[in-house]
Amino acid sequence: MGRKRKHSETEAPAPVKKSDEPAPDRPKRTLLGWKDKSEGEAEKAKALTSSGFKNKEKVLVTCSRRISFRYRSLMLNIVSLLPHCKKDSKVEAKSSKGATLNELIELKNSNSCLFFECRKHKDLYMWMVKSPNGPSVKFLVKAVHAMEEMKLTGNHLKGSRPLLTFSSNFDKDAHWKLLKEMLTQVFGIPKEHRKSKPYHDHVFVFSIVDEHIWFRNYQISVPHNESDKIAKGGLDKMTLIEVGPRFCLNPIKIFAGSFGGPTLYENPLYVSPNQIRALEKRNKAGKFAKKIKAKTRKKMHELSNPLEPDEFADMWKDDE
C-alpha cells in the first residue's frame, strides 16, 4: 500500500479573480443557424431607415338584404378583384344602418367600406366610406354588366395588383379630386399584402363622361415566346384586353362624416329613378288620355256631319 500524503505537502489552489465585465451575449439562433449580433444590428438599422408610411388599407364589402342576383354578382366580381377586402353578411337597410355599419367596420378592423344598397329590386346604390371620420360618397350604380354575362376573352391572375388610371377630368374640380383620392385608396391594393401577387398585369380605368364615372378593367397582354424578352419601354407590343365587370357611378352626395354628416357636395344634375319612372307613367297616361279624346272627337264629328241617305240602298229589297 502507498504511503499517505501529508496535509503539509498539498498546496492550496490560487483563488481565481472574477472579472466585473458582463458575460458576452449569446448570438441569436435562427432556422439557418446561429446569427451574428452585428448582422442583427445591421438588419434593425436597415428596417428603421426603410420604415416609413406603410399602406394598411382594409376594405369591408357588404350589401343590403333583398338584393337582386345581378347586383350580387357585380359585388362578388369586385370582391374577387380586391384581395385586401373583407366580405361580410347582409345588413338590414334601415335608418340606423350608418351606426350598424360603423360598428361592423370597427369589429372587422377595416378603415374603408363599400356598401351596396338595393331598393325596390331595381335601383342599386353604392356607399364608399372612409371610417370612422369620413368622408363618404353615395353613388347611383347604372349600366351594370357582370363578368358572367359578358364572357369577355381577357383574363388576369387573381390577386395581382392593378394599375389605376384616371382621365384628366378628375383634376378640374374639387369634388372630382376628392373622388379620385377615395377611389385610389379603396381600389389600390397595398404593396406586399399577404393575399396579393407582387406584379401588375391589369389596369383599372376610371373616366368621366357626362358627369358619370365609368369603370373598365383591362388585362395587359404581352405576346411573346420564351426566347423573346420585351424591353421595359416596349409599350408598342403590349395590348389591352377587357376583362370586366362594367358599371357606371353617378355621384349623388358627398358627406363629411361616415354614412352621414354635413353635405360637402350635392349633384345638381341628379334625377332619382323614382322621378324618371313617374315621368314615364305620366307619358303612358297621357297616351291613353289622347286615345280617349280622339275617340270622342270622332264621335262628335260623326254626329255633326251625318251621312246623306243613299237612294240605291233599298234597291234590291223589293225583289226578295
UniProtKB/Swiss-Prot annotation:
Residues 1-40, 297-320 are annotated as: Disordered. Gene3D superfamilies: Probable brix-domain ribosomal biogenesis protein. Pfam families: Brix (PF04427). Residues 57-260 form the Brix domain. Residues 308-320 have a biased composition (Acidic residues). One of its GO terms (molecular function) is rRNA binding. Expressed in roots, rosette leaves, stems, flowers, siliques and seeds. Disruption phenotype: Delayed growth rate. Involved in pre-rRNA processing and required for biogenesis of the large (60S) ribosomal subunit. Required for proper development. This is Ribosome biogenesis protein BRX1 homolog 2. It comes from Arabidopsis thaliana.
